[in-house]
From Swiss-Prot:
PANTHER family: WD REPEAT AND COILED-COIL-CONTAINING PROTEIN (PTHR14897:SF12). The lineage of its organism: Eukaryota, Metazoa, Chordata, Craniata, Vertebrata. It comes from the Eukaryota. The keyword Transferase does not apply. It comes from Xenopus laevis. Signal peptide: none annotated. Residues 517-533 have a biased composition (Basic and acidic residues). This is WD repeat and coiled-coil-containing protein. The gene is wdcp.
Length: 726
């Protein structure tokens, strides 16, 4: 359903959060108008009806329906503006059932702007929470007055988002990387900090929060920029598609899910090794992409090279979806990585199917996860168009996901946006959440059995369970195990956190593969190029030296030797050749950056002048505009001078050319019989003057002239040095 043009916030919003009312339908805004669209479900199929405009303001950033109490109770709608929030009451007229009566009940303002997702209603009471970056205000009598109270924030950090738990007993506020928990006292009308868990740090900057079931919330954390730079994603490797990894030759596995408790002890298995006993913590979905086992020698190497992770880019870290349960005396969490989305600031949860949708206002992908008892496997990925962004998510049923899509205009990525909002073409899209019953039953069934019988499982049973997980889907051994038994889409497998810089001719360089085996025998080798790549990108690979014959071998090495290798055998290359190959590729990389700098300079000219200088605008050779530069000897001004003719560039002369031509670092130019000025350069290196064609100018060394200025005779017959102006 097309909604037309609208101006929405760029990031941090879920425009469909608390946006659907059972009676009045969908509330949405184009940035100025408040619009209600009828929405009905016929046999679980959504049907959109007529739309009416009930208000128009200068700025509307969000709309939130209050809890549905009864059919005869007027509905409450919170309208979020820039620095204030108004609450409106809607009901149909008793005399005319088709006439909608709208009246304002209360309003709250703040010196600070309201956060993008700045309002959240209590699930069962007329209590509204308004958020700014510094304050949490609770309006507990929205139908009658503007009475409110502010939470006692024990932190100097910035507030980002908040939500009520599903049971309504707790308000969870996200401040930085910590969750601040508050208990609402309905009798005293107070908000008190939780006694057993007032603050719970989850170790990542929180983007969004959503209540799930009972006292549990789902939290998404972003991948910070400093972590992206620390991942060395630019020198990670890409495994060939034919290199299938089996369980028999893996030195270690990393559990996808991590569990934490209030004591701060990490319960999940370490990435360095995995014993069968550690499966009791999380016997469910395994992340088979983090299989590299580094030794201490690898950590001390000059280049710490890693295998490319098809899901997160480098195999080290990613944004995360975290489940936090606030129980009576303990707080526990479980987490799963979110591939391909750096800032997941949109969350939506369906309580019937126990599934959560994750998206970002800056990414065109939507991921759907299933909240099972012991794991959070990725079950579906929805891919939008390249210039489309999800601006809101909401589950209509357990199988229908409503997506508010904003289509952006093509913008110049070289410049950061100056405004917090942008114009979009808005439309509503309904996507069906697909379930593969056979694979879901097998995967989900195994998960439930593992969760319930985990304490009584033997070591042998755990081994069989892990082997069965690998055998179910051979094509996903190096990727995330999906309940449907299929590999993640190509978008997720090849998504990179840091895109490689390509030259403008569009050619692609050949790529090589990385295979990591025994950590003590890995060595770095630079593959030589068969052809010269135009973009001068570097291709790296790891190869294994030939192992010496020994009397005894470990079971791990026997498994590795028994399996046929799926990689290119290294050739005998001397260390000198390797060093030469490395130096050549470094030179190619520097060449690539030089070309990039040249293109950036051209882009700067285009943005400043509004057009690209075309060769068609050049003058013929016979009409070449040039100036004759006469370099005068500072010691002997009347002596012979050096002359050079220099071509003008749009009547401009480049200072560096003159300096290099005459070997002068500081130059003076003669403007009159006794006036000399020292030349400087602008941001582009040109002398900030225009010259005429066939003009002759006189210059000299300014340093020598300053030490030995030529003398002249004034009116009083006294000797005075000639003037010099800078």
């Amino acid at each position: 359903m097309e909604l037309g043009k609208g101006k929405l916030l760029r990031s941090g919003i879920n425009a469909l959060y608390q946006a659907i009312h059972p009676v009045h339908g969908l509330a949405w805004t184009d940035g100025r108008q408040v619009v209600l669209t009828a929405l009905h479900l016929n046999n679980e199929e959504p049907k959109f009806g007529n739309s009416i405009v009930i208000g128009q303001f200068e700025h509307v950033h969000g709309l939130y329906w209050g809890p549905f109490l009864a059919n005869d109770t007027p509905a409450l709608l919170a309208v979020q503006h820039k620095k204030h929030v108004t609450v409106w009451q809607l009901c149909y007229s008793p005399s005319d059932k088709n006439k909608l009566v709208v009246s304002q009940t209360c309003e709250i303002g703040d010196p600070f702007p309201v956060l993008p997702q700045g309002c959240t209603w209590h699930p069962s009471k007329d209590i509204l929470v308004v958020l700014t970056k510094r304050d949490v205000s609770v309006l507990y009598a929205v139908r009658y007055e503007n009475s409110s109270l502010k939470a006692d924030i024990k932190s100097s950090g910035l507030i980002h988002c908040a939500c009520w738990t599903k049971d309504g007993s707790r308000l969870v506020v996200a401040i930085g990387s910590a969750l601040h928990s508050y208990i609402w006292d309905s009798k005293q009308k107070t908000l008190n900090a939780c006694a057993f868990c007032p603050v719970f740090d989850i170790g990542g900057y929180i983007c969004a929060i959503e209540s799930t079931v009972d006292s549990q919330v789902a939290v998404s954390t972003e991948l910070p920029l400093d972590r992206i730079c620390a991942l060395n994603a630019g020198i990670a490797f890409t495994m060939p598609a034919s290199s299938e990894i089996t369980i028999s030759n893996q030195p270690g596995l990393l559990l996808m899910e991590e569990e934490f408790s209030m004591d701060g002890v990490q319960k999940s298995a370490d990435s360095g090794s995995l014993t069968t006993d550690s499966l009791a913590t999380s016997p469910a979905t395994l992340d088979l992409t983090h299989i590299v086992n580094h030794s201490k020698a690898d950590l001390n190497s000059l280049l710490n090279l890693k295998k490319k992770d098809y899901l997160t880019g480098s195999g080290q870290d990613s944004s995360h979806l975290i489940l936090v349960s606030f129980e009576k005396k303990v707080t526990t969490t479980r987490r799963v990585s979110i591939p391909g989305i750096l800032v997941p600031d949109i969350l939506a949860f369906d309580p019937t199917a126990h599934i959560v949708a994750v998206a970002s206002n800056t990414c065109s992908a939507v991921l759907v996860y299933s909240l099972t008892s012991s794991s959070v496997p990725n079950i579906q990925q929805i891919q939008l168009e390249k210039n489309e962004r999800p601006k809101g998510l909401c589950f209509l049923t357990d199988k229908m996901l409503l997506v508010l899509v904003g289509r952006q205009k093509t913008s110049d990525p070289a410049f950061l946006p100056s405004s917090s909002s942008d114009k979009y073409l808005i439309r509503l899209m309904v996507k069906e959440v697909m379930f593969d019953e056979d694979s879901s039953a097998s995967s989900g069934g195994n998960t439930s059995v593992q969760a319930s019988n985990d304490s009584c499982m033997s070591i042998q049973d755990k081994k069989k369970m892990v082997e069965s997980l690998y055998k179910e889907s051979p094509s996903t051994h190096r990727e995330l195990l999906l309940p449907s038994g299929t590999a993640p889409p190509t978008y997720l497998r090849k998504k990179k956190l840091i895109e490689e810089i390509r030259s403008y001719d569009g050619d692609q360089s050949p790529t090589s593969s990385a295979n990591e085996f025994d950590e003590k025998r890995n060595r770095l080798r630079m593959e030589s190029f068969d052809t010269e790549p135009k973009n001068c990108s570097v291709t790296l690979s790891l190869d294994m030296d030939k192992k010496p014959i020994s009397g005894s071998t470990s079971p791990k090495s026997e498994c590795q030797n028994s399996s046929p290798p799926n990689f290119i055998q290294p050739s005998d290359v001397s260390p000198q050749q390797e060093i030469l190959s490395i130096s050549r590729n470094v030179e190619r990389l520097c060449c690539n950056f030089a070309h990039l700098q040249q293109h950036l300079s051209e882009l700067t000219d285009i943005t400043r002048n509004g057009k690209r200088p075309l060769s068609a605008s050049y003058l013929p050779c016979r009409q070449a505009p040039y100036v004759t530069v006469v370099c005068q000897d500072a010691y002997h001004p009347e002596g012979p001078a050096m002359k050079r003719s220099i071509l003008l560039c749009e009547n401009k002369l480049r200072l560096g050319t003159v300096q290099e031509l005459f070997g002068l670092s500081l130059i003076e130019m003669q403007l009159g019989p006794s006036l000399w000025i020292i030349l400087t350069g602008d941001s582009e290196g040109f002398i900030p003057l225009t010259f005429l064609a066939n003009q002759e100018i006189t210059i000299r060394d300014a340093r020598i002239a300053a030490m030995h200025p030529p003398l002249r005779m004034d009116r009083n017959n006294s000797m005075q040095p000639s003037s010099s102006v800078t």
